[in-house]
Amino acid sequence: PYGHVVAESVEGINTVNGHSYSDPALQSENTNFALLVSNRFTQPFNEPYRYGKHIASLSNMLAGGVLVQRFGDLVSGIRTNEHRMSKSFVRPTLTAAVPGDLSLALPKRQLDDIIEMIYQLDKIAPGTANYDTLLYGAEVKFYSARLALSGELETSLPGFFAVGDGAG
């Protein structure tokens, strides 16, 4: 509840993330949540990080930044434009997002998974699959980041050691 979509930058690529605020002065009327689709690649492919960056960069190429699309337009195969967005009862919290067509930026398999999940969520949270539900893209998470460590787990910062997978 009270969600906001915010811009992030991943190595110069504009992506999105979400926040909810307990401070009433910062709250919105929207609920924000992320639907992330994971990929498990098989050999010979071994560049998941580059693949994710490429997907994120497609929305930047199409919109000059983050794309936003109404769910109903997406499933109808219609590009959301400024006129359609102005008719939406859900107002975007990331006003810099550009109305567009996420199907041009996200691979079909991932898009199908997101659409299916929204329909399933609608069964337990009616209204999730509303025509005016807003989808932003792209949000990417990289869980394969690797730190350069010495044999003693020391980073390039002298006296600074790291353990774990680095995702948190």
Protein language model annotation of sequence segments:
Residues P1-G168:
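Residues forming the flavin
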